[in-house]
């Protein structure tokens, strides 16, 4: 067997070791003692434990480095480098004694501090701590790094980036899920799979918290969301509340693990309460079990996510356009004075109105766009659960935002120009994002659908050439103004149709530009949106605060048999207050322009937003502590 983890993963199955803490406690480790220090003070004890797991059939053993970060070691008098070097040495010695082909994993657990915004540890500080561990492990000769027992997806991201940017080690990550299929911080299985797969880990999975039987629903769902090798390291069942002993025997454990093979699991091991006897039983089960070959490659749906919510692009989804200073005087003033509350209110209002994803653009002369984008992404993610679309023309701004974003975002945008392709696509690949491709190039926006289609093809080919999967490429065929280029309206719609049906890509359109310079803009936008949806538009970028626009999407999904049994439509409108019909002959109210985002013009019947949405906005505003965020929602709720 080649000593290479990626080659090892090509086998039918791989066996990892079991618990280290359980073995150290059985050997007499005192309460409160730092386990990692024993690698220096009692090296033969550690070598002996590793040897037992190797003899039991483990292909990979974890070095005694779980808590070897500077935060946890600050009171023990030992450095990260000292602990890691000694621990890797002990594990490698055990391999030489028993199985020279076995691999040694640098085992890395959570830092022990909560990251912002829940805690006080910054992303950069977490990254630096993981960098220190990874550099020490790589120098000491580890064969791979495993980040395990993780609960915070953003901390996972910091760890993975540190490993990839400061070593060539293969990377595996296992997170810890509760019975509700969420981690302690609320991370869901779908978001874990989407984010970590995008970051390019070699394997991912679950460990700790529950026994094999209790973890089965978690494993089942995870198997639906990734084609990467899956690791399962459960506890030895659940602890008895009286004796504190785990309730599953080695033989029972192996039988339960056998039952998980139907989900295509590649890597089997144990966590708390497991011993070499457990690993021996698992190894023997795998060696004798004829039920191999369960794994098959699955089609993962196009999706983006926050840590707590995944949004699949399997039906039309609304991207809220309001967090953008273009043409918005109040927004520009808020950016110039650093008023983040204004931006957060825009986020809450759009979600309450029906946005599935929020576009975030803070480009404005006179401000530091990079720092403002970082602040906006962090602040918005602290109070809402929808995914974000990071919108900037500056690659450095995109890089900074993608780095701190928690989950899998959309990048807006790349285009067919060579400089754009070279600058943006590598960022999309590195951070595992989705990307909007604009059908323009060095010659501008082609007037004909055929030429826009060719640019879309080129963007897709370049993306796939560097490893960006097809499902992460969304194409914007670009909306031109009907008042100036009326013949171009159908060209845009034809391009959308061809990109969707011939290339099989998801499509995006900024809708409101169609009506620029025309009266009654809402009407034009509304009808154009409906036409675009019929031609295959997946992601309309609209102002969700205009009821006619969100209503068009909801009604389309109902009529196209996407919204089964009209569930979403009824939920949105069943309790809608009656609205007095407007006299079509009435003149517009003073100050009404009919522009997108303004008061509706005469002849338009306004549809009310359900009261529940306003209450939800008020809740989030209070929860987030917005200085200016509560009053508008309080007034709306009172009226309704």
Question: What residue ranges belong to the model's regions?
Answer:
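Domain-level signal for soluble alpha/beta catalytic cores
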Residues: 1-474, 480-640
